[in-house]
């Protein structure tokens, strides 16, 4: 598929793959052992996947050591690598194309209609679930709507008929080319596999549904044994593996600090070592305004109150401002409020119209205000006056989606055994945007009303996770921002 892409000559990923191939060829021919090879986690996971299936390695496969940075992302990267996703529009179109090629579309109209009806049922169910949760599901992943055993049996039977027809016509015997493409056959086979797994209520897979931006439906499924797969591949090599991240400890003392991350990536490890940086966090300040609007009341009044806090804080800030959200709808609500105010700052909205890099490059020129979510929680490196005010609107608890539900079940514990460690990891990632060098200092603001409660059960865990400990009151904010 990659070789057929019209944009392959401009694609950075394609160019990198080719360079790696050339590098591997040079290594083999010259018996040269490279000292350092840098790849992203997506490519690393794909490399281990290819090795598992006995295919040629993408990268040099006999290193002296593997160092994995930002290891808190490894589980999700491996899950993405093992996930099969079926798009409703693509499935229907490819099945229709294949049926047309073999002259059997009219014969399979009933089959195709039943498959379409099932996808529409999933879309309606997903939309209902999202709206029920205030349209604020951060991952967008919801459970698949079950159908009766009889209905699923019919779906399997009808899809199997299509697969068998495509399979026969995929083989070119007396013709120059097959009638049905490999892609059409693969898509039909993936759909059949999905239906069979759903029918068997397989406990080896996690299933979920997502609504796409084009109002289509994506059905995804992946093996649930992510930790076991990582243990057998990445962590069972003949060379040592070192895992790094600034955010994977979940306790202030050293005892069992890595317990959660080790559990979800299947890495038991032989040695643990917590290193502390010497950034001057004492020079920065933490501010939690009193009387914040209730965090779970996402109405016009809520966005007005949050918008007011952001407006007042950012207006006093001479450097750049980053506002981190946990849901796109919250960005929309706050932006609608800010756009009505006489704001002397340029606002950059993470609405998908521009890439993160495009937003960052424009932001550097104006020291404005970024309203961001998702990727803006990590990987941003804005030093000195480029970022002096960081506002976190809500504590970044993960959504209880099908994947989180499975993790909770696996740990045989309450929701909090999963959602609290994941919230702390995400929170640390976000807070880490503010102080990037020994010369940096800034103001960290939390706008989550739960932090106003003296007896909030996770308050101590949140405060312990923050490297910035010195709190200030409202009447100190202006002077602090003016003196940065």
Task: Give each language-model segment a name.
Residues 35-41:
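Extended, Lys/Arg-enriched charged tracts that mediate electrostatic binding to polyanionic substrates
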Residues 268-273, 339-360:
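Conserved RecA-like helicase motor-core motifs
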């Amino acid at each position: 598929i990659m070789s057929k892409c019209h944009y392959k000559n401009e694609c950075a990923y394609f160019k990198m793959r080719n360079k790696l191939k050339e590098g591997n060829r040079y290594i083999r021919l010259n018996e040269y052992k490279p000292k350092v090879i840098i790849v992203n986690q997506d490519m690393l996971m794909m490399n281990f996947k290819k090795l598992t299936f006995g295919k040629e390695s993408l990268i040099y496969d006999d290193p002296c050591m593997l160092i994995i940075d930002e290891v808190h992302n490894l589980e999700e990267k491996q899950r993405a690598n093992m996930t099969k996703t079926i798009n409703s529009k693509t499935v229907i179109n490819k099945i229709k194309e294949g049926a047309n090629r073999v002259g059997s579309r009219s014969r399979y109209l009933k089959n195709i209609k039943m498959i379409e009806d099932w996808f529409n049922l999933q879309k309606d169910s997903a939309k209902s679930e999202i709206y029920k949760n205030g349209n604020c599901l951060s991952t967008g992943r919801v459970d698949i709507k079950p159908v009766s055993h009889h209905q699923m049996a019919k779906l399997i039977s009808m899809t199997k008929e299509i697969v068998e027809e495509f399979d026969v016509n995929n083989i070119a015997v007396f013709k120059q080319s097959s009638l049905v493409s490999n892609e059409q056959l693969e898509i039909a086979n993936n759909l059949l596999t999905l239906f069979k797994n759903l029918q068997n209520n397989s406990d080896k897979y996690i299933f979920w549904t997502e609504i796409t931006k084009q109002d289509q439906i994506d059905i995804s499924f992946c093996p649930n044994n992510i930790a076991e797969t990582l243990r057998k591949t990445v962590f069972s090599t003949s060379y040592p593996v070192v895992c790094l991240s600034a955010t994977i400890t979940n306790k202030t003392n050293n005892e069992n600090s890595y317990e959660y991350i080790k559990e979800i990536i299947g890495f038991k490890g032989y040695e643990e070592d917590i290193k502390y940086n010497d950034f001057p966090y004492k020079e920065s300040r933490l501010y939690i305004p009193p009387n914040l609007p209730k965090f779970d009341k996402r109405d016009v009044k809520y966005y007005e109150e949050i918008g007011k806090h952001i407006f007042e804080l950012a207006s006093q800030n001479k450097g750049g401002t980053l506002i981190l959200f946990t849901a796109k709808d919250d960005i929309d609500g706050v932006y609608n409020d800010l756009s009505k105010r006489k704001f002397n700052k340029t606002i950059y909205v993470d609405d998908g119209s521009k890439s993160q890099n495009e937003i960052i490059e424009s932001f550097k020129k104006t020291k404005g205000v970024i309203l961001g979510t998702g990727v803006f929680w990590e990987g941003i490196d804005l030093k000195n006056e480029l970022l002096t005010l960081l506002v976190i609107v809500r504590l970044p608890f993960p959504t209880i989606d099908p994947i989180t539900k499975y993790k909770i079940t696996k740990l045989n514990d309450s929701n909090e055994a999963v959602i609290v460690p994941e919230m702390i990891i995400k929170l640390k990632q976000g807070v880490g945007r503010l102080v990037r060098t020994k010369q940096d200092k800034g103001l960290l603001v939390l706008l989550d009303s739960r932090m106003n409660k003296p007896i909030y059960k996770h308050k101590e865990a949140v405060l312990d996770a923050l490297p910035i400990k010195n709190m200030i009151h409202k009447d100190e904010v202006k002077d602090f921002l003016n003196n940065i």
